[in-house]
Amino acid sequence: MAAVSGMRRTRTVSPTRWIVYAGSVFAGAWLATQLFYLVQIALWSFINPGSTAFMRTDAWWLSRDKPPAQVQHQWVPYDQISRNLKRALIASEDSTFATNNGYDVDAILQAWEKNKARGRIVAGGSTITQQLARNLFLSREKSYIRKGQELIITWMLETVLDKERIFEIYLNSVEWGRGVYGAEAAARYYYRIPASRLGAWQSARLAVMLPKPRWFDAHRGSAYQAQRAAVIARRMGAAELPQSQ
């Protein structure tokens, strides 16, 4: 009897309790990640981002080239970027950018149908703000989980920043080729001029590149690029630029 009473009982934890515990840890980590994103975006109201997730990934790979290379990137203020380029990007990437809330529901639904038909993710229906969310924080991976996070960050950007600031950060961080980021670096890389001097045709050709900048960098002067640039050039006059608030 004494031996029995001296034995310590082993407490078992029910599977339900483990599930609740694991769920709490996951939820806490998820909320902490969202808070990190939100704080970063709030800081960018008055501080320019030093780099993006895409830039850091490229910098890692470029450092392993032989000889090692570096990311080309130079921040320039919004008013030092050609209005031609601004109009070309809006005409090409997001015609309702100045007035939308960061989402294009019709484009998202069309992308969903296309992806379902192909059996894989081939389109995203992303607005300029969604592209910026991906460039700043996420990866090039195509998945519905990443898309969901992109939509949340898009809401944060649209809530905290005005449209002109969103566009300024986008213009300075979008990729235009392997290791080439932002309007200033692109203008100097492709045309050897500052972004402030980009003409309408040069801007239209740069806008064409954005869906596949590395492919177009390797296939400069393709017939498709010229044809698509002509279409964008015709639409540029109707492109509405955002106004600062």
UniProtKB/Swiss-Prot annotation:
It is found in: Cell inner membrane. It is a single-pass membrane protein. Its EC number is 2.4.99.28. Signal peptide: none annotated. It comes from the Bacteria. InterPro entries: Glyco_trans_51, Lysozyme-like_dom_sf, PBP_transglycosylase, Pep_trsgly. Pathway: Cell wall biogenesis; peptidoglycan biosynthesis. It catalyses: [GlcNAc-(1->4)-Mur2Ac(oyl-L-Ala-gamma-D-Glu-L-Lys-D-Ala-D-Ala)](n)-di-trans,octa-cis-undecaprenyl diphosphate + beta-D-GlcNAc-(1->4)-Mur2Ac(oyl-L-Ala-gamma-D-Glu-L-Lys-D-Ala-D-Ala)-di-trans,octa-cis-undecaprenyl diphosphate = [GlcNAc-(1->4)-Mur2Ac(oyl-L-Ala-gamma-D-Glu-L-Lys-D-Ala-D-Ala)](n+1)-di-trans,octa-cis-undecaprenyl diphosphate + di-trans,octa-cis-undecaprenyl diphosphate + H(+). Pfam families: Transgly. GO terms for cellular component: peptidoglycan-based cell wall; plasma membrane. GO terms for biological process: cell wall organization; peptidoglycan biosynthetic process; regulation of cell shape. The chain crosses the membrane at residues 20-42. GO terms for molecular function: pentosyltransferase activity; peptidoglycan glycosyltransferase activity. The keyword Membrane applies. Keywords: Cell inner membrane, Cell membrane, Cell shape, Cell wall biogenesis/degradation, Glycosyltransferase, Membrane, Peptidoglycan synthesis, Transferase, Transmembrane, Transmembrane helix. NCBIfam families: mono_pep_trsgly. Belongs to the glycosyltransferase 51 family. Peptidoglycan polymerase that catalyzes glycan chain elongation from lipid-linked precursors. This is Biosynthetic peptidoglycan transglycosylase. It comes from Burkholderia ambifaria (strain ATCC BAA-244 / DSM 16087 / CCUG 44356 / LMG 19182 / AMMD). The gene is mtgA.
